[in-house]
Design a protein with these regions (language model features):
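Hydrophobic anchor at the beta1->P-loop junction of P-loop NTPases
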Residues: 5
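Glycine-rich phosphate-binding loop used to anchor ATP phosphates in small-molecule kinases
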Residues: 50-95
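Conserved lysine of the Walker
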Residues: 13
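Conserved substrate/cofactor phosphate-moiety recognition/catalytic segment
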Residues: 18-61
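NTP-dependent small-molecule kinase module
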Residues: 23, 126-172
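Walker A (P-loop) ATP-phosphate-binding motif of ABC ATPase nucleotide-binding domains
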Residues: 2
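The conserved Walker
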Residues: 9
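A glycine- and Lys/Arg-enriched "phosphate-lid" helix/loop adjacent to the NTP-binding pocket
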Residues: 88-135
């Protein structure tokens, strides 16, 4: 099984990726961990592309979380069996980001790149509330739904996510 988890910051992409990776006994690739070097420095795009390509070439199943439309995006969407988009309310996402920061302050989450300490600042708050959910990004998700209707799953709130997980829909 090959699964993409796309969506908004703070919606729970990494948590869901770990759950599904465990269920399928599939490797999980957190694209944040590929995109960033220690200290939240962005990796050179060609190197990022090479790392993701190598991952895709060497695994027959996977769970991948993160958007990163410039990193093997078309190939990822084409190869994946399910494309799950988490599009929760902006204020819920912000609350979850704050809660995540509080729980992990001074530490590096396992879904982050080594040396990227959990942080929250005005720029990231702006990203969660506005920049990360632009009309263009939302239109991109709608385009994926049109292009891959048979494997597209939109989850808009925690209740829908709980229903999805309890229904076993992910195991089809």
């Amino acid at each position: 099984m090959k699964i993409a988890i796309l969506g908004l910051s703070g919606s729970g992409k990494s948590t869901l990726a770990k759950q599904l990776g465990s269920f399928y006994h599939a490797p999980v690739l957190h694209l944040d961990a590929v995109h960033f070097l220690p200290g939240w420095v962005e990796r050179v795009p060609g190197e990022e592309e090479q790392l993701v390509t190598s991952f895709l070439d060497t695994h027959s199943s996977w769970v991948m979380d993160g958007n990163y439309t410039k990193t093997c995006y078309a190939r990822r969407l084409e190869e994946e069996d399910q494309i799950i988009v988490l599009a929760f309310n902006r204020f819920l996402c912000l609350w979850r980001v704050i809660r995540r920061w509080w729980a992990n302050r001074g530490a590096v989450r396992d879904s982050s790149a080594p040396g990227c300490m959990e942080k929250i600042d005005a720029e990231f708050v702006w990203w969660v509330l506005y920049q990360g959910r632009t009309p263009a990004r939302m239109a991109g998700y709608r385009q994926i739904a049109r292009q891959y209707p048979e494997k597209f799953i939109l989850i808009q709130n925690p209740r829908q996510l709980a229903r999805f997980l309890s229904s076993g829909s992910y195991s089809q």
